[in-house]
A protein has these predicted regions:
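Conserved ABC ATPase "signature" region
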Residues: 101, 116-135, 159
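Helix-to-loop junction immediately C-terminal to a conserved catalytic motif
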Residues: 52
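Catalytic Walker B motif of ABC-type/P-loop ATPase nucleotide-binding domains
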Residues: 163-167
């Protein structure tokens, strides 16, 4: 019997019967974080939408805790898995707290009435994501970054075993970006929440992930640990970089070096020369 908590086998995804990415296979244990990376338009969102049953897979299986996802009822699936997508949600005449509370609907009766215990869970989700100051504000009158935090609270309010997020940090400033990912990582470690997300920030993907899935157009190019993915020239190759490169040693993107005969020789160690390198590059001065 397999020990994997969530896995896919022979998964093919696409639109209107036309395959986009074939033979998607990955395995996750409970409490692991999987990050999808790859160029724009490579198919990361299509994969995520297929995992959450928003798109019907063209072939293969998705298995959650030993049960095929397509055999689960909608209510059971919603209790196991919650989602935060990049698509805009615009509920009219609802406060942020009321939007968060909709995450409890899979647990309510047909009239959708929340119990005192449900409201305690709502309040805890609001507190966890630090949106107390937004709770009574009209959801439509908040910024994109604030909406993203509200939707995370809504997803956590569902008390899922698996959390799926599509580019969750896109509209967040630096403070909330780090806070957002810290919350997710803490819940994965302490509550064994399994997380599947897509990110454009490679430095954050390298730091937060247990596993990384590299999407390249019509195929999955690699699946492995960050140490197996963020090494050598692979990231530069995956993204087809021509105006610079990804430095696997520092985990940073670097611009094309200034051409010409070096006029300056920099001696440094332990990353202490980075500020000098940056300044010389800005001034267009070749260095070695």
């Amino acid at each position: 019997m397999r020990e994997d908590y969530f896995y896919t086998e022979g998964l093919t995804v696409g639109y209107q019967g036309v395959p986009l990415i074939r033979e998607i296979a990955f395995q996750l244990k409970k409490g692991e974080i999987l990050t999808l990376i790859g160029p724009n338009g490579a198919g990361k969102t299509t994969i995520l939408k297929s995992l959450i049953r928003q798109l019907k897979p063209l072939a293969g299986v998705i298995v959650l805790e030993g049960q095929k996802a397509d055999e689960m009822s909608g209510r059971d699936f919603a209790r196991k898995l919650s989602v935060v997508l990049t698509e805009r949600v615009r509920p009219e005449m609802m406060t942020c707290k009321e939007v968060v509370a909709t995450g409890r609907y899979p647990y309510t009766g047909k009239f959708g009435v929340l119990s005192k215990e449900d409201w305690k869970i709502v309040d805890e989700a609001v507190r966890l994501v630090h949106i107390e100051d937004l709770a009574e504000r009209d959801f439509t009158k908040t910024s994109d970054g604030q909406k993203q935090r509200v939707m995370l609270a809504r997803a956590l309010c569902q008390q899922p075993d698996i959390l799926v997020l599509d580019e969750p940090t896109s509209f967040l400033d630096i403070r909330y970006k780090l806070e957002f990912l810290s919350i997710i990582q803490e819940m994965a470690r302490n509550d064994r929440l399994t997380v599947i997300l897509s990110l454009h920030e490679l430095d954050l993907a390298e730091r937060i992930s247990d596993k990384v899935l590299c999407v390249r157009g019509d195929r999955i190019d690699r699946f492995g640990t960050p140490e197996e993915i963020f090494c050598g020239d692979y990231i530069s190759e995956l993204y087809g970089m021509t105006a610079g490169h990804y430095d696997a040693g520092t985990g940073e993107l670097e611009l094309q070096p200034v051409s010409g005969v070096p006029k300056v020789f920099v001696i440094a160690g332990g990353g202490r020369g980075k500020a000098v390198f940056r300044r010389l590059q800005r001034q267009g001065m070749p260095f070695a």
